[in-house]
């Protein structure tokens, strides 16, 4: 290698002179256009200025004198790496003389070598042999040179008595192709520059700097002709030469112009990508350079955004600027201007430190022209660049590094040396070696030379105690240095390789030797003035010379930059070899490994562990003494600080100062726990706890939500409690940073009350230990209490409150006192406390009957907070009560030593413990009231009657209260335990009237009814009075349900005695039959009631099978259809004979007897007769929702009275517009541009980039060509936009969509349809999945539409980030929003499922696919898979992933309850057990956004509307703007209600459909009714559609439609019809609509309803048979006997009109042809009634609470 050869030559070349022929150093990454003469001239001036600072000798006169040529002095340039580079030439000065240019006529004589590619080359010296070069004209242009374009200049000074050497200039390569001409011109221009002809090269404007001479023109012509053969010239060059064959200048000018125009953009991009900055140039210049490049690129249409620009700039930062990469690389919104502010700050700090450096020489004013020499003994700090951050990290700027050396002997003193490097930089490979250095020399710690070094010189350092040098070629008598330690100003070690002598040969021919240390780890070669003074040499800075004490001048001193230098030419080279030095300093016996190196090698372990391991020889090869431990204590590894970052440690007991600083109840800790899932809405889901810092007193409060107002209420309560009860004011409240505490509402409240909030730091839960530990303790107690007592989970907060009471009374081990004692309260009286879950009997002071038992079993929870009573849970009523009327159940059968946990509370010790308290109650019980206080905040079922509790159980009513304790001993119960089967998800709608306590019938007379008694209809009315005493004496607290399946025969006139089973008895007792008249009397005068017996026991007595000529269903088919339907439970009624008045009722079609419940039957007749004795629940009253616009008419019926004319004065009811959905998406400006929520904005930006990347990945448009807007037909241009929204799972989504709403009709096929799965198909699939134990898997295909190609030629505007507003791109994929995208995707996925997955689409049901194992429901990009075998689903998923980006949302493999979010439905599914469908989370989020004032704290609505009122027909008198505003509001409200209703809330469809007809008639009345509906939805948002698995004993699928109609109750006398569809007893759909034709009778309306149900019933039947191969039974239930009769009849002559007859005949054909069973159902059990009319609260609940609750 060249570098190896040069390192062995004599250094005499340093003193040789050379004419300057190089005007600029050209780097490999230099702009190719930076060769113009103007730039060359600038560099020539800089070179001349540098040369003038050194003692030089004029060069040889062989150079032609030309005033435009560069100065003939030796050019000085900064060497790029390590030390001065010798000048290199390939053409002598004589050859460069214009007089000898004819030499180029003989190119073979030019010496040339392939590997000596430098433009200039100097031989090592006159004493070394010049190498023999092969003869060659030049290399072809296609052969790159290893160092092409690099120019190295001489850096040594020339003595006046030395002659210049010859110079060789390398010729340009040969041109070999016309395509390479411009590249060849670049090399040719460099050749001219090296030939000292840079001034004739044309500039950018085409003119040279000076005029060209004739000789130069000849030289130019000859060289151009030699190296650019005419056959390889491009055409435009030949055209120029054809005019003037000597016009080479024009060719050069034209070439430069072409290169500039063709490569400007590319050069700018390359320059920007290869930016480098380390502070060596002013920051302003660097900023100007970068901004100019970015501006040019932006002006040329290449937009560089801030993020990309900042990344390019930071990537090129080095030195002290490098840390900016790590401090700013995560800032998304960082701008170039902000980045340059940081760069300027560091640069100014560097300059300030440099300017503050003291000067080496004395102040001229102090010297007073004294030329006497002196020795500088001070130790000034000299600024040096520090490429790495120091350990102490005191400043980012470079610091002075004084170096001190010391021996390992006690007598060694420490001095300092300035200008040392700070940190070694390791070389990566041998190419990093510098010229003059052999590969065998140690290179692991070499550093880059500083830019301000004067090459070939030694730096004079007045503060250094030793001389240091990097090159070993001048060291004499080198030896190892085991006893020398060198440190810099920061006390960091500098490794020393060797110690030797440095010998000088000065101008007076004397030789002087001083000691020198060899190290490659410094920036400059340092010459210590202290060591020169030791040999009688001083530095005189007034004369700038080194001199002896006698005034003899030894050598000149050169000032370069801020420092003073002495030339190395006075040094005598040594004959020592470099390997010798390396062997000396790398001796294993002397070198110690630095601790940072060992620390990194041993996986960043700590120093203590490493030292211990070395001592115990667990790590071999080196010992503890081989490691330098001096920096181990203070060493900070930045990687460890980042990788091992931990939270700060909390000191135990550090919080004690707060206990001394604050008085009791002045410093509180608070925290919230929750939510607890799967609880009824009446039970709290959260609790908030408070703990006093000083007393440790604790409070807990239940919470149903974490809203601001709920938290504020609790804070207000506890602050008032502390203020009034303890006369203290809270000063500080410590809490975490949850949103419930950091909201503005609470902050203002605390500020208003003068309370200081104390928040924990981020992710520091340990700082909140008091509150966190309390919550953990209470939850542990809660789980234990519930486990021990067996109580249901919805009583969890009662266990929390019980634990709080106890914990406040227990003493702390530290303070030896309890929290109550600290607070000044008395201790807890344990005699008033019962174990949690203690079985008790509560007195019922108001039972349903006087002969019913007065005791109700319950479980004690905790002492009441608001009274002296106890909170007791009553499972039979599903309520908690606050009462003192209870008796503790005790039993001696279960002892503690038997470990029967169910009997632990029955021990007699409990009775002895509570004896005093019971005695106190007994003595005062006579004066107490029998009333019970119901705890309203945890009441599970407010609709239950509250008059069912009574006093404690006594043998007789006359037993005095004083015998309470004695009598209670008679009550014995073994192993009483709360029933675990109590559903924890119980809610208000779950409650039916309690089960019958006895099977004994009861007779109640008219008088008792009139006096306020209650009729009981849950027992037969034929039981004799004599049985009552037997019933009372044999009654127990729990009884079995009485079944009436055999109570009555099918004969309506003759009845036998009814067998009655007595609880606990073995004999059956009979009840004599009463007279027919008495039975009628009792029936007429009784109030209608509701029974809780199952449908299996009584429904068959009211079903009338219809047998057609074609179908004769068996009795088991009839029972099978009715058995599993969720029909309400009604009491069995004995067959009776109606009186004559009933026989004379008008015909069935008469308008006079039409009931609001529809149809005429026995039940309607009873209701009509007994309407004056309705119970309170049937009254048409309800709590008003607190909205200021509601008036006294707000609880109205949607059914108008018959006497009113129902005609609206606008056409709204005739043509209802489509309902507009609520806009849940955001535009780009809303989500990003003007979004003030920074966190949300960043998430939307991230979603934006994700969507753009997905579009590019899917090749949505053609990226090869952009079209001009003027060239494309406007009809084919589709506008595009970005929309943003937040999904239900909380993720942020961005979607690039097309504006299909303004798409031209010619751009899509209107016949194509976008199909999605029908909701009935989805519900059917879900129902079959439950019955057949299917696995349900939910999938999502990302960017589904983009997989479908688009056939039409469409163009869209590019996304905004591309910045091409005037361009268009052609679509290749079906973009979201296009009219045809849905259809294209449907066809794509359909073909894939059929061909690749072996599926087939169910005929008549689009998007439902099946094969032998799997069923798929497809809704755009969502897929729901149903399969008996989960592996079958996985197989389909694997196939889909081959083509589409398929995400598994829920695999559904768990056997426990799985939660899904399928098409808006929140589904809870447990295989083989149940499925629950609801929308609680969605409604909780969306309903408050409707701008409807909801009433969360008031009494909740029990029905969506009430019968009895009608919609007024008054004309609206409002202006146009208000009308549009109200219509828009109605569209939003009804839109959401309609979405929910048709999903699963089928009980609301009637109200939704009726209000939807009035969207364009937004009167105040209509709006109020709509608000009432929304309020009801809010109150019942937790309701769910409940499905249970079908009984496995029934192999058939049963599909049933229940039909109903309400005659003439709609505007224009239209009827409302409704149908409910059930599959295997599960409601899967419903429909409520206004009849399209005006019916003339109730029967006609019923026929119309049945005719609407049968087609859908048949379609569903086909779907069920396709998905499940079991046999299917189809049934239709209606409460119209006349409709059934018409369907059954064969008479065709009695139809009123042709339409009616056609409908009837069609029904007959469909019933007979489809094997359809038609049955009668009572109106009271017809659940389709809710689809056709508004119902009273009681009836509404009765018809819906079995299938939706």
Swiss-Prot record:
It is found in: Cytoplasm; Nucleus. Pfam families: rve, RVT_2, TYA. Mg(2+) 2 binds at residues 1340, 1421-1422. This is Transposon Ty1-NL2 Gag-Pol polyprotein. Initially, virus-like particles (VLPs) are composed of the structural unprocessed proteins Gag and Gag-Pol, and also contain the host initiator methionine tRNA (tRNA(i)-Met) which serves as a primer for minus-strand DNA synthesis, and a dimer of genomic Ty RNA. Processing of the polyproteins occurs within the particle and proceeds by an ordered pathway, called maturation. First, the protease (PR) is released by autocatalytic cleavage of the Gag-Pol polyprotein yielding capsid protein p45 and a Pol-p154 precursor protein. GO terms for molecular function: aspartic-type endopeptidase activity; ATP binding; DNA binding; DNA-directed DNA polymerase activity; RNA binding; RNA-directed DNA polymerase activity; RNA-DNA hybrid ribonuclease activity; zinc ion binding. Residues 1332-1470 form the Reverse transcriptase Ty1/copia-type domain. The record marks 401-402, 582-583, 1211-1212 as: Cleavage. Its EC number is 3.4.23.-, 2.7.7.49, 2.7.7.7, 3.1.26.4. It comes from the Eukaryota. Residues 299-401 are annotated as: RNA-binding.
